[in-house]
Regions:
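Subset of outer-membrane beta-barrel
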Residues: 9-479
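Sec/Tat signal peptide C-region and signal peptidase I cleavage site
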Residues: 3-7
Length: 479
């Protein structure tokens, strides 16, 4: 049965009375891990580990010198909490009652995991945004309740380091999931409306060995939720979808986002060091052991042949004795190989942690471009059910960041600034200032999941601008 044509979205300032619109999920503010926030988002050329994957998908395949084994894995958990949301979306506060959007209305959670094998990397990062609006009408009970929105983007990434890891290319699949439900509690007892969208992403970094500079670029094509998974909200005769007293949009869109970045490192600390595995460092000694094993195998075959040639009633017993003798030699060679690799691993690890100069001064710069979104309003416009079109023009955000280890082996500091252009015609760009730090903590192998020398760090960052303030927290490894 065909769905009746829905009403068109009205002019700016009018009440939303139709589902024939989209939410522009573009972010003007920097939302990411503490390092990315502290650098004001200028991390496209510095992306590494889970913390860099949201800026540049090639981060999944970056192999740093801190882990000299053939494999590596990264686990991360970051949170961003806007503690001052007077104008979170830089909309100019021209719609609705800003008191309805409390300081605890918006929250971001970013967990992720990467696994790397030689120069290949795969990973998953989840970028989740939680929004709650108090005072929505539950159509079942006709009582005031809390309308909750979840915008979750799953980044499934893979990448490879070419030219011995100097040219890193990565890409992947993005899954955008929008969930809408009425509940006074954060866990959902059932979604009123849920949609899904699929998209792609691509990133590249060029980090020439021993050079002070690096380059990066990333592209995230437009992503839109077009697959409706569930709809328990009521539907009007015009085909509009209503949850409580809210007209829900037919889709959520993230515009095309492109970034280019550049970084330069000053100081004595080695820049863009190549990744060296323990096997590479011990290659000559391991080759000698391999030669010993091949020679022993030849000797074993010759000796068994001589025993068979002599013959006699106990020939099989003699052959087994020969095999046992050489089995002990092979076990000794295998043990020596393991000891050599462990020694090389410890040497590389110790050299990186203690032998390298710690002082460095890192400058980074990015230029991010956000594309247009047709027939869309901002999240705030949806919250207040008042039309304020968003994404009608392309926006450009220049960003610059600085990082240094101000207290060797104890603390890193970073800071930066970026311009946030508005996605709305009624507002203007604003200037952000950011500050972040890493603090070295304690050693803990997490019940054997990490090496005994693994030392943890606490990371934090703040971001201030007109009518906006946010802080980010995270935990990870100190290197």
């Amino acid at each position: 049965m065909p769905v009746p044509a829905a009403a068109q979205l009205g002019p700016d300032g009018s009440t939303i009375t139709s589902s024939d619109y989209a939410i522009d999920l573009s972010r003007g503010v920097v939302i990411g891990t503490s390092r990315v926030t502290g650098l004001s988002g200028a991390a496209t050329a510095l992306a590494e580990g889970v913390e860099g994957g949201l800026q540049n998908p090639s981060a999944v395949a970056y192999r740093g010198p801190q882990w000299p084994d053939w494999y590596d894995y990264w686990l991360a958990l970051g949170t961003t909490y806007p503690f001052k949301t007077g104008d979170f979306y830089n909309s100019g506060r021209v719609v609705g009652d800003s008191g309805r959007l409390a300081n605890d209305s918006i929250f971001f959670l970013i967990p992720g995991a990467y696994f790397q094998m030689w120069n290949l990397g795969v990973g998953l990062t989840i970028d989740a945004q939680f929004v709650k609006i108090e005072g929505a009408i539950d159509p079942v009970t006709m009582e005031r309740d809390t309308l909750r929105l979840r915008f979750t983007v799953f980044h499934i990434q893979a990448g490879y380091g070419f030219l011995d890891g100097q040219l890193i290319i990565g890409g992947g699949l993005r899954i955008l999931r929008q969930r809408t439900y009425l509940s006074s509690r954060l866990p959902s007892e059932g979604d009123s409306y849920k949609t899904l969208g699929l998209g792609a992403e691509l990133g590249v970094m060029f980090k020439p060995h021993h050079k002070a500079w690096s380059l990066g670029a990333s592209l995230f094509p437009e992503l839109s939720t077009g697959v409706r998974e569930r709809q328990d909200g009521s539907q009007t005769s015009d085909g509009d979808i209503v949850v409580g007293d809210f007209y829900v949009p037919r889709s959520t869109r993230i515009p095309t986002v492109g970034s280019v970045g550049f970084s330069y490192q000053f100081g004595l600390r080695p820049s863009n060091p190549p990744w060296v595995s323990a096997e590479q460092l011990a290659a000559r000694d391991l080759e000698r052991l391999d030669h010993r094993k091949r020679a022993a195998e030849e000797d074993e075959r010759d000796e068994i042949a001589r025993v068979r040639a002599r013959g006699g009633p106990e020939v099989e017993i003699c052959i087994q004795a020969v095999k046992q003798t050489y089995a002990r030699r092979y076990a000794e060679i295998k043990r020596s190989r393991k000891e050599l690799k462990n020694l090389a691993w410890e040497m590389l690890r110790r050299e990186y942690r203690q032998g390298w100069p710690r002082r460095y001064y890192l400058l980074s710069a990015d230029l991010q471009i956000n594309g247009r979104v047709d027939n869309a309003v901002g999240v705030e416009s949806f919250i207040f059910q008042t039309v304020q079109r968003s994404g009608e023009r392309v926006t450009v955000s220049p960003r610059i960041g600085f990082e240094t280890e101000v207290w060797p082996q104890r603390m890193k500091l970073r800071g930066g600034s970026y311009l946030e252009p508005s996605r709305f015609a009624e507002s203007e760009l604003r200037i952000h200032g950011t500050f972040g730090l890493d603090i070295k903590l304690f050693k803990w192998n997490v019940f054997g999941l990490w090496p005994d020398d693994y030392r943890w760090q606490l990371t934090g960052a703040v971001d201030f601008a007109r009518d906006y303030g946010a802080f980010s927290l995270g935990i990870g490894g100190w290197y």
